[in-house]
Amino acid sequence: MASLRKTHPLIKIANDALVDLPAPSNISVWWNFGSLLGLCLITQILTGLFLAMHYTSDISTAFSSVAHICRDVNYGWLIRNIHANGASFFFICLYLHIARGLYYGSYLYKETWNIGVVLFLLVMMTAFVGYVLPWGQMSFWGATVITNLLSAVPYVGDMLVQWIWGGFSVDNATLTRFFAFHFLFPFIVAAVTILHLLFLHETGSNNPAGLNSDADKISFHPYFSYKDLLGFVVMLLGLTTLALFSPNLLGDPENFTPANPLVTPPHIKPEWYFLFAYAILRSIPNKLGGVLALLFSILVLMVVPVLHTSKQRGLTFRPATQFLFWTLVADMIILTWIGGMPVEHPYIIIGQIASILYFALFLILIPLAGWLENKALEWV
């Protein structure tokens, strides 16, 4: 008699994904981030749900309702701090997950990779509309500046901006719809995540060697279920430590001031996890050019599989491309730093050089290095 987990129509699906899934025996801790992202999403949905029970999406009460949550609601301060810092951990895991994919050539699973890029965009949109909700100064001005970028779209730009705003400026209609979007998007993210997994399980996981691992598989449970559990403990420990000891470390002090359309903050900048893209946007003096560069800074990930020139899958045995990969990591850190700096010398030129290098690495240098390594292998 086969066990219930192998016969029940619903439990069978979970079993094939979480229990009897054949996984490569050599996948390292870098393969933990997928499950960590799932944990982040669940944490954000749960804390967000409890916050939504007490939040009011009206410009006259939004800021006060957040203060009320932190002061008067049972453990409201904790729920809010976990939700706000959970977003940062979400993006840390996202960037590490993408970096793993780039390093080990996981992007060659094209459907899985492209759905992942769509997920990345969806999570970015969710985080952006969520940042507007507390209705502080940086919430308001961040929303104004970023939505205003759509006015760069030829012909329909201005109409598009007014359509998103629901008026002629960021106002009550904007806040209400952003709350609706912020509530909806995580569930769309959850649905697309299932698609992401569906396509991944068509091929099975990649591994650090970049070789076919069909001959050497082990079951997901207990080996990787416990390994994932360890990752959960480490991440939750980090998240609770940040949320309890320095919850405002990654936030902007401007957001402690209620939104005021008449006073512009000295430096308008998004949360730290968007700064690299913001730096690329600012480094182009033309509005439409900046918007296109911003968009392409994310969409460039979609062309990575097309530009794969190497005979080998990962970078494990490719020192030249390894060097360029770590150059890309350093470049991202520089862009993040520049995004938080004022627009003045020398930050402008550093940002422009870093932006050019960012695209050059993806589109020219890494594919070229792969081709050169192929040539070098022919001489061995």
Swiss-Prot record:
Heme b b562 binds at H83, H182. Keywords: Electron transport, Heme, Iron, Membrane, Metal-binding, Mitochondrion, Mitochondrion inner membrane, Respiratory chain, Transmembrane, Transmembrane helix, Transport, Ubiquinone. It is found in: Mitochondrion inner membrane. Binds 2 heme b groups non-covalently. GO terms for cellular component: mitochondrial inner membrane; respiratory chain complex III. InterPro entries: Cyt_b/b6_C, Cyt_b/b6_C_sf, Cyt_b/b6_N, Cytb/b6-like_sf, Cytochrome_b, Cytochrome_b_C_euk/bac, Cytochrome_b_N_euk/bac, Di-haem_cyt_TM. One of its GO terms (molecular function) is ubiquinol-cytochrome-c reductase activity. Its main location: mitochondrion. One of its GO terms (biological process) is mitochondrial electron transport, ubiquinol to cytochrome c. It is a multi-pass membrane protein. Component of the ubiquinol-cytochrome c reductase complex (complex III or cytochrome b-c1 complex) that is part of the mitochondrial respiratory chain. The b-c1 complex mediates electron transfer from ubiquinol to cytochrome c. Contributes to the generation of a proton gradient across the mitochondrial membrane that is then used for ATP synthesis. The cytochrome bc1 complex contains 3 respiratory subunits (MT-CYB, CYC1 and UQCRFS1), 2 core proteins (UQCRC1 and UQCRC2) and probably 6 low-molecular weight proteins. Belongs to the cytochrome b family. This is Cytochrome b. It comes from Formosania lacustris (Oriental stream loach).
